[in-house]
């Protein structure tokens, strides 16, 4: 497998995250809640579940495709570190409610999205 392909996919994922995040966070309401980070993480969880189901469950894609798209594109598209930074920032400014809602929604919906993606990918 080519490390270059993983790197190119990672670069594309990072650019996609930046564009999606900027588009969502630039809408009315701004950064009262980190919707851009939330959206890419939930979408990425769904897509990685789907990709895994298609590779492992159905064998429709080669395992190498899962590595390039999963570790490369989706690994760069989603962002655990930015999510934690958003939580820290909410706590720093004393907005414990926003931090709790962000943590609960991101974790709960992220797990649900991954499960849904797996179910769709496996065909169940």
From Swiss-Prot:
Location, primary (coarse class): membrane
Modulation of this protein's activity: Na(+) is not transported, but it plays an essential structural role and its presence is essential for fluoride channel function.
Record-annotated membrane-spanning stretches: 4-24, 36-56, 67-87, 103-123
Highest taxon, organism lineage: Bacteria
Protein keywords: Cell membrane, Ion channel, Ion transport, Membrane, Metal-binding, Sodium, Transmembrane, Transmembrane helix, Transport
MF-aspect GO terms: fluoride channel activity; metal ion binding
Residues given in the record as Na(+) binding sites: 75, 78
Subcellular location: Cell membrane
Record's bilayer topology term: Multi-pass membrane protein
Pfam families in alphabetical order: CRCB
Nuclease listed as a keyword: no
GO BP terms in the entry: cellular detoxification of fluoride
Keyword Lyase: no
Reactions it catalyzes: fluoride(in) = fluoride(out)
One GO cellular component, as annotated: plasma membrane
Cited function: Fluoride-specific ion channel. Important for reducing fluoride concentration in the cell, thus reducing its toxicity.
Family: Belongs to the fluoride channel Fluc/FEX (TC 1.A.43) family.
Name of the protein: Fluoride-specific ion channel FluC 1
Organism: Symbiobacterium thermophilum (strain DSM 24528 / JCM 14929 / IAM 14863 / T)
